[in-house]
Amino acid sequence: DLPDCCYDWMQFSGAWARERYPKTRQLEQGILSVGSMRGNSSHNHNPFVILKRPDTDEFQGEAIGFSLIYSGNFLAQAEVDTYDTTRVLMGIHPSCFDWKLEAGESFQTPEAVMVYTDQGLNHLSQTFHRLYQKRLARGYWRDRERPILINNWEATCFDFTEEKLLEIARTAKETGVELFVLDDGWFGERSNEHAGLGDWFANTKRLPQGITGLSKKIGGIGMKFGLWFEPEMVNKDSDLYRQHPDWIIAAPERRQSHGRFQYVLDFSRKEVVDYIYSMMETLLSDADISYIKWDMNRSITECFSNTLPADRQGEVYHRYILGVYELYERLIGRFPQILFESCASGGGRF
């Protein structure tokens, strides 16, 4: 709560490939808000807002930043009442969310971080950077420089062979690139966007010696090797879907919406997370992989889990995010020196 309303509201909005443009408007009586109901923080709005005095610039003046440490549906809002006082709210979006607590159970909310400065927006930004670099980021890569990488996707899309990939890597090595990343198309029967997601084993028609063989050849060039995954997604034309059609998030007896011809696996279910972990762990154990590009190319729709009763369907969105966090935690614990980079069709998820 703030005792007055003499602030400008700054939000960071946009769309795919043009995320986080600053937009500013003056507070007045009523509510200003941003949020997401897409199952992720979205390309449209970031879970971060600033209240600043009208005369604040980059290097002087008061500002308060609010950042939600969460990857799912969120709401951030500021309300000015009839007395011109301001109340800021930030957390899990209340729409389509509820959580049933049994006796003796507890619920942990996401953390909202608030930073104040009287030295301008640049100081506010630097304070958040230092805080997250030292208190949120962790592990082997926290204080290390990231390698310079090249990714084959824009050069080849799905049309590649092992020799074509090695040619790209050799040329990149000559320019000082340190890491070669193989993007979409290396797994299952993945020759286009319609098939293969969920089958995280090498397509030996393209890669005769699999990922293990390719990673050794990239290492022989003198480069590190990285790999693209989209662990949360599945195509209906895949071994995984044929074996477990009930593993997707979908409302019973309703049309199943797809995005990029793919469906969202129900990560609120432990057996689904366990299965994906097992496939990824096997591959990462066998091959020399230094980097993972973790993608998420569609939003969640028809949010329903087959394993939860009707009175707990409001938990699915949040349980899904907890499942994603669990998979990250298990993989990072098992492979602490792999660099994980989060991609959600670009900048679609915090």
Report the location of each language-model feature.
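Polysaccharide-binding surfaces and accessory modules of carbohydrate-active proteins
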Residues: D1-E79, S95-F97
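Non-catalytic terminal segments and appended small domains
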Residues: L2-D8, F12-A15, R25, E189, ...
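Glycine-rich, aromatic-flanked loop segments that form ligand/cofactor-binding clefts
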Residues: F48-Q77, V115-Y140, I148-N151, V177-D184, ...
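Short acidic, Pro/Gly- and aromatic-enriched capping/linker segments at domain boundaries
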Residues: T82-E102, Q337
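Short Pro-Gly-centered flexible turn/kink motifs
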Residues: W99-D118
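Glycine- and acidic
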Residues: P147-T156, E162, L197-F201, F261-L265, ...
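Aromatic- and glycine-enriched glycan-recognition loops and surfaces
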Residues: T156-R242, D274-S278, R319-I332
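Active-site neighborhood of glycoside hydrolase catalytic domains
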Residues: N203-G210, L214-I221, Y241-F350
